[in-house]
């Protein structure tokens, strides 16, 4: 039994161009996150974009997508917070202040921080996201994920679709989830108290283990709907091209508006 598999990177498309377009989509979604929350459940459109980049463009370009999106969104958030505070001090343009507050997000509380600290924080956030996506992309390639690299229309046995795409993709997704959770947990713990002696390090690793066990089931629930969205983006990319991201973002924007009302 065979199935027709369309190239996920059309021959006429440029990989670097596609990576920059996906980075722009991820940047927009970082500025105005699309989420649906029920207790601890959250869905964001940014992760499917970087996962699709991981499959479509390979490790280096996927890291570029994640890093540019996070760095751009963080930098824009800080600048928006600075402008908003200036306008507020002058009591000018209240509507623009509200718009800037939405973009600034958590950076509103850090608007007065020195530029050197902000740059270090932005580079740290961007590099962490890039490393997580890059590691997942390397794992995807290492365990046989290669269907997305075909540049022609081919007929492939269904078994090959599973061994060279579906299975590697979900293993890479699990790796991304684990890396992302570990880095967040370590950042939280190290931010509270840095280990100094052997006993501190033992407590540090024990707490990391406990938090990881507690957070993984919650994170798995949060990421539950993201693989299907990623697969939808990959499918649409074949037939629609680089604007496939907009096709996916539209329904999520409508869904968020419905939930927020």
Model regions: which residues?
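Hydrophobic, membrane-inserted alpha-helices
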Residues: 1-3, 26, 45-51, 224-233, ...
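Membrane-embedded alpha-helical segments in integral membrane proteins
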Residues: 1-9, 53-54, 137-145, 229-231
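Short, hydrophobic transmembrane alpha-helix segments
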Residues: 2-16, 31-39
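Transmembrane helix interruption/hinge and helix-loop junction motifs
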Residues: 10-12, 54-65, 235-244
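Alpha-helical membrane segments and adjacent membrane-interface helices in multi-pass membrane proteins
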Residues: 19, 23-141
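Transmembrane alpha-helical segments that form the membrane-embedded catalytic/substrate-channel core
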Residues: 27-33, 170-190, 254-261
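Alpha-helical transmembrane segments
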Residues: 53-55, 59-64, 157-178
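Interfacial "cap-and-anchor" motif at the non-cytosolic start of specific transmembrane alpha-helices
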Residues: 186-261
């Amino acid at each position: 039994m065979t199935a027709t598999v369309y190239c996920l990177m059309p021959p006429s498309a440029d990989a670097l161009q596609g990576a920059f377009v996906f980075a722009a989509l991820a940047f927009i979604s970082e500025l105005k996150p699309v989420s649906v929350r029920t207790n601890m459940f959250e869905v964001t459109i940014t992760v499917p974009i970087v996962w699709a980049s991981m499959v479509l463009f390979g490790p280096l370009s996927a890291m570029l997508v994640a890093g540019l999106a996070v760095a751009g969104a963080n930098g824009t958030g800080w600048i928006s917070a600075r402008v908003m505070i200036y306008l507020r001090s002058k009591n000018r343009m209240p509507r623009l202040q509200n718009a800037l507050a939405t973009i600034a997000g958590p950076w509103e509380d850090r608007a007065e921080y020195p530029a050197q600290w902000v740059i270090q924080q932005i580079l740290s956030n961007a590099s962490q996201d890039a490393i997580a996506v890059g590691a997942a992309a390397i794992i995807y390639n290492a365990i046989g994920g290669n269907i997305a690299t075909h540049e022609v229309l081919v007929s492939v046995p269904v078994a090959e679709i599973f061994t060279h795409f579906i299975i590697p993709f979900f293993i890479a997704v699990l790796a991304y989830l684990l890396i992302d959770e570990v880095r967040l947990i370590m950042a939280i713990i190290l931010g509270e108290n840095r280990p100094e002696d052997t006993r501190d390090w033992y407590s540090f690793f024990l707490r990391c283990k406990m938090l990881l066990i507690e957070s993984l089931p919650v994170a798995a629930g949060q990421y539950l709907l993201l693989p299907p969205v990623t697969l939808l983006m990959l499918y649409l990319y074949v037939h629609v091209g680089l604007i496939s991201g907009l096709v996916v973002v539209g329904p999520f924007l409508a869904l968020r508006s419905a939930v927020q009302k």
